[in-house]
A protein has these predicted regions:
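Conserved pre-motif C helix in the palm subdomain of viral-like polymerases
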Residues: 1-58, 64-65, 75-87, 161-187
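Flexible helix-coil linker/hinge segments at domain or subdomain boundaries
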Residues: 24-28, 92-107
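Short, conserved micro-motifs composed of acidic
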Residues: 103-126
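A short acidic-Thr-Gly-centered motif at the start of a beta-strand
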Residues: 47-54, 229-238
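Conserved beta-strand elements of beta-rich interaction domains across eukaryotes
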Residues: 1, 69, 74-75, 132, ...
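RNase H-like nuclease fold core
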Residues: 235-256
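C-terminal reverse transcriptase regions that engage the nucleic-acid substrate
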Residues: 5, 119-235
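Well-ordered, non-membrane alpha-helical segments in soluble/globular domains
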Residues: 76-100, 149
C-alpha cells in the first residue's frame, strides 16, 4: 500500500493490531497456518552474541502496513509464541477473506512474501530498506541501493540545473539514507534544504559548487559505509558519563 496511499485511520488500525500482539505474547495460542514460514530450521545455528544475553526483551513495531518483531530470546518455544502472537494479532484486526467473505482483494498477510522468506526470523534482516545485524548491532544499506545512490550523485555533479520535483525526490532518498546511516549525516543537508527554500513550484534548482561538493562528500561516505557497517551506538548518542548544571540557567555537560 505504501505511505502515500495510506489514510490516517489505517495507521490507527495497524497500531491497534500492534497493541493486540503485545497482549497476545502473554497468552498460549493455537497454531497458525502460516507460522512455519517464519520459524527457522530447528538445526539452525543461532548467534552466540544473542544467546549470551542475560535479560531478554520483545519489541513490536508497526510502520504503516509493515509489522516488525524483534526479540533476544532465541529459544524455539519463544519464537513459536511470538510468531503466533503476530499472526493471530494481525488477523484479529485485519481479518482474512475466509472470515469477511471479501472477494477480489489481497489477504492481509501476504503468503507470497512469506514464501520469499521475508517473515523468517533472522539476526541479519532487511527492514524498511536497511540491513540490520542484531548480533553485532550494526546497520547498513543494501549494496544495490548504495550503487544506485552513487550513480545518481555522479550524474548530479555533471548537471548545472535540475527540476525542483526531481531534486526533492533525490533529497528525500539521500535524507533517508544519510541521516539514519551516517553518523552526523544530518549536518550535510543544510545547503540542500536551503537550495529548495523559496523555489517556486515547477521551478529549477541551480546546482552550485557548494551543492556539488556535498554530493561528492556523500558519494564518498556511502562508499565507506558500504564496506563497513555502522554500529548503532554511533547513531544514537548515549548520556554523557558526567553531566550536571553547567551554570545557573542551563543544564548540560560539565559543572562547577
Amino acid at each position: 500500500m505504501g505511505w502515500c496511499e495510506s489514510p490516517p485511520f489505517f495507521c490507527a488500525a495497524s497500531e491497534m493490531a500492534r497493541d493486540v500482539i503485545q497482549q497476545l505474547l502473554k497468552v498460549d495460542l493455537p497454531p497458525h497456518p502460516f507460522e512455519h514460514y517464519m520459524l527457522p530450521d530447528a538445526n539452525a545455528t543461532l548467534p552466540k552474541e544473542a544467546q549470551d544475553l542475560a535479560n531478554t526483551m520483545d519489541l513490536i513495531e508497526a510502520f504503516v502496513d509493515d509489522f516488525i518483531g524483534c526479540t533476544d530470546n532465541l529459544t524455539r518455544s519463544h519464537l513459536v509464541k511470538f510468531t503466533r502472537a503476530m499472526m493471530h494479532g494481525m488477523h484479529s484486526i485485519f481479518q482474512p477473506p475466509s472470515v469477511t467473505g471479501h472477494k477480489g482483494g489481497d489477504p492481509p498477510i501476504s503468503k507470497k512474501k512469506l514464501e520469499q522468506l521475508e517473515g523468517l526470523w533472522e539476526h541479519v534482516k532487511e527492514i524498511l530498506g536497511w540491513i540490520l545485524d542484531g548480533a553485532n548491532y550494526t546497520i547498513r544499506l543494501p549494496e544495490k541501493k548504495v550503487e544506485k545512490i552513487q550513480a545518481t550523485l555522479r550524474q548530479l555533479r555533471k548537471k548545472k540545473t535540475i527540476p525542483l520535483n526531481e531534486f526533492q525526490k533525490i533529497a528525500g532518498t539521500l535524507h533517508h539514507a544519510a541521516s539514519m546511516g551516517i553518523p552526523g549525516g544530518r549536518g550535510l543537508f543544510t545547503a540542500i534544504w536551503s537550495a529548495m527554500k523559496g523555489c517556486q513550484k515547477n521551478g529549477w534548482i541551480k546546482l552550485t559548487p557548494d551543492l556539488k561538493a556535498i554530493f561528492s562528500d556523500l558519494c564518498w561516505l556511502f562508499r565507506e559505509i558500504a564496506n563497513k557497517p555502522i554500529n548503532v551506538a554511533q547513531l544514537v548518542p548515549n548520556l554523557p558519563h558526567c553531566h550536571g548544571y553547567a551554570d545557573a540557567c542551563k543544564y548540560g555537560a560539565g559543572g562547577v
